[in-house]
């Protein structure tokens, strides 16, 4: 079915724009549901797709894109969302295994919690592909497909470096750093990439953190992590820092946010504290090119986002599924980096893309990821 997968990928230019319109806050029962189509089992059986939640726009896109590609290629699929509940995701995976899945594609909620259920999958010769989040502490994960998450952080750090003129000795500037969910392996890579750029400037005094929440090393990243990547939690944390450490003439100059969900909450906290778009507005980073954040960029409330075109990730994973089921060699390009504590997982890495307000139309509209109408352009 390789040709079918390749052909189906051509449909995603339109699908990306359509899926962006899917609600971020659907009916509560939708997360637990599945979306299945029928195809002859002899063509490859059922492909189980386990996504973490519908509450973030990007996972809606990931699930829709991957499901569409696999169905167009003739595979039966079971797409399920777990409402960010680990036990629910485990139950969904077990049901997929019992239902005759031949491949499981898993975007895990907790990368350390799936060992037993995936061991059951391995005992039944079911191939497991970790989708964008590494599954840890088990040998029952066969492949991993993701974006270069360290590079994502590097791009955020370099953007801050360039915007503030740090390499030219400018400063001091007040920095407030955030990190992602401590149970998400990717969050470590995001932070390490950025902190490898920024920590030298913290140590030199060019970047100062009034809250004191500047990790001394990459290994301490989880101390500033926001569990579950929640916008509301990020907003509350930023409000606390602003209220506790910023008064009078003390202003925040830059906020390192690892993704758009956190950036959305941080921007709301900044607005509530009286920061308005313009010359005095802090540099604020992000990742994912979520629609609300792109609109914030247009409005001057966010400085950049690192775009991971999830259509390309879906295409790559669909290709890997097809290679597995056809008995061919599965395409990977990194067999050294992603050690899950038990094994180094063969990985395919995709490159991310920096988007700033001036390049929104070029990258996001020109590619069909959003329409101009969606963004109010």
Residue spans of the language-model regions?
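Sec-dependent bacterial lipoprotein signal peptides
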Residues: 1-16
């Amino acid at each position: 079915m390789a040709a079918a997968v390749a052909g189906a990928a051509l449909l995603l230019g339109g699908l990306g724009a359509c899926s962006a319109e899917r609600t971020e806050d659907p009916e509560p029962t939708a997360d637990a549901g599945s979306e299945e189509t029928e195809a002859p089992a002899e063509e490859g059986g059922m492909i189980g797709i386990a996504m973490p939640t519908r509450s973030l726009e990007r996972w809606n896109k990931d699930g829709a894109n991957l499901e569409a590609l696999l169905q167009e290629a003739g595979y039966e699929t079971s797409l399920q969302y777990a409402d960010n509940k680990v036990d629910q995701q485990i139950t969904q995976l077990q049901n997929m295994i019992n239902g005759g899945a031949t491949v499981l594609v898993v975007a895990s909620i907790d990368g350390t919690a799936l060992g037993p259920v995936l061991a059951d999958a391995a005992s039944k010769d079911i191939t497991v592909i970790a989708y964008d989040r590494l599954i840890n502490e088990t040998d029952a994960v066969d492949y991993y497909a993701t974006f270069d998450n360290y590079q994502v952080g590097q791009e955020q750090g370099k953007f801050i470096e360039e915007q503030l003129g740090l390499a030219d000795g400018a400063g001091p500037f007040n920095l407030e750093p955030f990190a992602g969910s401590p149970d998400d392996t990717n969050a470590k890579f995001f932070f390490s990439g950025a902190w490898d750029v920024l920590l030298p400037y913290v140590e030199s005094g060019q970047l100062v953190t009034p809250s004191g929440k500047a990790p001394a090393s990459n290994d301490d990243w989880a101390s500033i992590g926001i569990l579950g990547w929640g916008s509301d939690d990020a907003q509350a944390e930023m409000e606390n820092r602003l209220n506790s450490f910023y008064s009078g003439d003390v202003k925040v100059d830059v906020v390192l946010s690892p993704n758009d969900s956190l950036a959305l909450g941080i921007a709301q906290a900044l607005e509530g504290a009286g920061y308005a778009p313009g010359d005095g507005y802090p540099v604020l980073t992000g990742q994912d090119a979520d629609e609300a954040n792109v609109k914030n960029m247009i409005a001057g409330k966010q400085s950049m986002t690192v775009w991971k075109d999830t259509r390309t990730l879906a295409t790559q994973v669909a290709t890997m599924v097809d290679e597995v089921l056809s008995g061919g060699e599965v395409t990977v390009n990194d067999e050294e980096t992603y050690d899950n504590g038990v094994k180094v997982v063969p990985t395919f890495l995709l490159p991310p893309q920096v988007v700033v307000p001036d390049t929104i139309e070029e990258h996001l509209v020109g590619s069909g990821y959003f329409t101009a109408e969606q963004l109010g352009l």
